[in-house]
């Protein structure tokens, strides 16, 4: 039985010594296709972006740059905001890890919500929606951290060691029960 070798998946010491004797492995970061030409890459990216914009403009007959409908197979109509489902204009959800803020805290002192125009592709010049005004993201995260340190479901323990579920068993119980 002394000839039998049981492997645990790792190489034997002899193989490890032989591997170290070889020249050291090169870095895993390799330049497979030569140096990057950043100007050419930027030009290609711009061309691809323009091609995608033109394809979308042809497909939907809508000028997404100027937010204007174009002539084509679709007939665009302006719609009142109240006739749309809420999910088209409500503010995005907070991240999953964020605490829930009571409604009273997100309102100003008079208890009213402020109308804030949307930015980017969601906004038209006349669109304003009732949303809570956002400040700097660092301020929001600091505020959430302060709010999250409130009531806990289970108090934090001062012990550095985790509690063992079997801690109340004595040695007699352990030897009798097994």
From Swiss-Prot:
Basic and acidic residues compositional bias, start-end: 126-137
Motif (Nuclear localization signal): 153-169
Cleavable signal peptide: none
Interaction with CDK2: region residues: 51-91
Phosphothreonine found at: 157, 170
Protein's cellular compartments: Nucleus; Cytoplasm; Endosome
Subunit structure: Forms a ternary complex composed of CCNE1, CDK2 and CDKN1B. Interacts directly with CCNE1; the interaction is inhibited by CDK2-dependent phosphorylation. Interacts with COPS5, subunit of the COP9 signalosome complex; the interaction leads to CDKN1B degradation. Interacts with NUP50; the interaction leads to nuclear import and degradation of phosphorylated CDKN1B. Interacts with CCND1 and SNX6.
The name this protein goes by in its record: Cyclin-dependent kinase inhibitor 1B
Biological classification of the source: Eukaryota, Metazoa, Chordata, Craniata, Vertebrata
């Amino acid at each position: 039985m002394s000839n039998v070798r049981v492997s645990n998946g790792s190489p034997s010491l002899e193989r490890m010594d032989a591997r170290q004797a070889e020249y050291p492995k090169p870095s895993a970061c390799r330049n497979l296709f030569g140096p990057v030409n950043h100007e050419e890459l930027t030009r290609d990216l711009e061309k691809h972006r323009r091609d995608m914009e033109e394809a979308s403009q042809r497909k939907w007959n809508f000028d997404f740059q100027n937010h204007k409908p174009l002539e084509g197979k679709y007939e665009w109509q302006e719609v009142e905001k109240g006739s749309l489902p809420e999910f088209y204009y409500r503010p995005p959800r907070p991240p999953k890890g964020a605490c829930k803020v009571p409604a009273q805290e997100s309102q100003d002192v008079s208890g009213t919500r402020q109308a804030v125009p949307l930015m980017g592709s969601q906004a038209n010049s006349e669109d304003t929606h009732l949303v809570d005004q956002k400040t700097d993201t660092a301020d929001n995260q600091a505020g959430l951290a302060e709010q999250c340190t409130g009531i806990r479901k289970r108090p934090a323990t001062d012990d550095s060691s985790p509690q063992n579920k079997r801690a109340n068993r004595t040695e007699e119980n352990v030897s009798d029960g097994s």
